[in-house]
Structure formats: structure tokens, C-alpha cells
């Protein structure tokens, strides 16, 4: 009898061959009918418009909203959107590099370096700063003391799950608005020409200020500081609300 391992291998070949055959025949037929390759049509009709939409404020805010919604539910939002997000970020960076190589000005602001500096870092760092400024809750301040170190490197899990921000309806609105405000400020700065578009791949975990400096020069540092300050201001009223909630809970227990 044929060994099971060999049988399994050949069984796996059947769907592979059928898939390749179907795509090949379909692509050939499309080429004969339309005069262009299927992959080219997909790029010009679907991918390129989506790339343009992703570089717009609406596209940026929609994907941030989806990401933050998953985080609110306790699901790692960045990992969920990563398969959809990263190809567009990589394409934008490649377009910027190609523009520089051709002696042109890069025009795609939203790259992975942009995401690291102006979307990832505003998640938990402004929360820590707002807590240190106005929060009277000992539990919040204890979490902030632990989370501030990782937050400087864009690691938000200690704050997200420690405070927690998960299922925290009081902090839901600022957790979305703060990121949108910081990233929107950066996008505006790029649009008006103050902050150059990123042409360097900035790795996740690059600390605050350095991430902006590597990706966007000194202008990026200025924009990041402004964005983080605005994001912190967004959190302050909600921290005051959290103070009152804690006082009410303590009064009810007494």
C-alpha cells in the first residue's frame, strides 16, 4: 500500500493544480478579451484607488477606528488589521523612495514610519501623562508608573490591559480621539509641506522623538510633541471624570 504521507502529499496537489489551472485559464481569457493582464487590471481598478483612499484623512481615520474598536474589545487591533494595512504602508514607502530616486518630492505621507510615530505612540503615552497630571486614583497612578516605560517605545499592552482601557467606556472616546488627533495633525503637517514624507523604514519599538526624527526629521519631532500634547489634553477631562467615579464608588462603600 502507498504510505499515508505520500498519499497526503498527492491529495494536496489536486487543489493546487486546479487553482493554478483556473487562474491561468481565467487570466489568459481576460487577456484575450480585454487586451490587458488580469493583475494589471486589479492594480489599476482596485488596488491603486484603495492606496489613494488610504492616504486620505478619511481612510486613515477609518482604519484607526477599526483598530481601536478591536482594542476596546480586548483584541489586538494592530494584528487584526495588519494584513490589510501593511501592504498599503509598504507601497507608500516604495513610492516615496522611487520618487526620491527620480529626483522628485515624495507625496505619500502615511507609511509604516508614520504609523509608528503618530499612531502607535499616542495610544498609551498620553494616558500616562494625563494620569500623572490630574488623576487622584491610586490604582491609575500605580499602573501609569509601570506603563510609562514601555509606552515610550510604543508598547501599550501594560496600559491597555492594566488600567484597563479594555471595555472602559469612560476612556473609549479619548482613546479614539487622541490617536486621530495626533495622526491628523501629522497628516496636516505633511499636506502643507512642513513635515517631509517618510522615506526610511522605521521599526516598531523605536522610542518617542527618535521615531519621528528618523522618519521625518526635526519637523517630525516638533509635530510629534504637538500631537502628544494635544492627545494628553484630550484625556484630562476624562481623567477628572474617572476621579469623580472613584470618589462616588468609595462614598457608596462607606
Per-region residue spans from a language model:
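Alpha-helical transmembrane segments and their helix-start/interface "positive-inside/aromatic belt" motifs
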Residues: 4-20, 73-77, 167-175
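Transmembrane alpha-helical segments and their short flanking loops
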Residues: 94-103, 146-149, 160-254
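Transmembrane alpha-helix interface/packing and boundary motifs in multi-pass membrane proteins
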Residues: 65-78, 90-91, 153, 158
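Hydrophobic alpha-helical transmembrane segments
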Residues: 54-73, 106-125, 211-233
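Membrane-embedded helical hairpins/re-entrant loop segments and their flanking transmembrane helices
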Residues: 98-113, 120-152
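Hydrophobic core segments of alpha-helical transmembrane domains in multi-pass membrane transport
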Residues: 16-29, 63-71, 123-132, 178-184, ...
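Interfacial/capping segments of alpha-helical transmembrane domains
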Residues: 31-49, 76-89, 192-200
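Membrane-interface helix-loop-helix junctions at boundaries between adjacent transmembrane segments
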Residues: 1-58
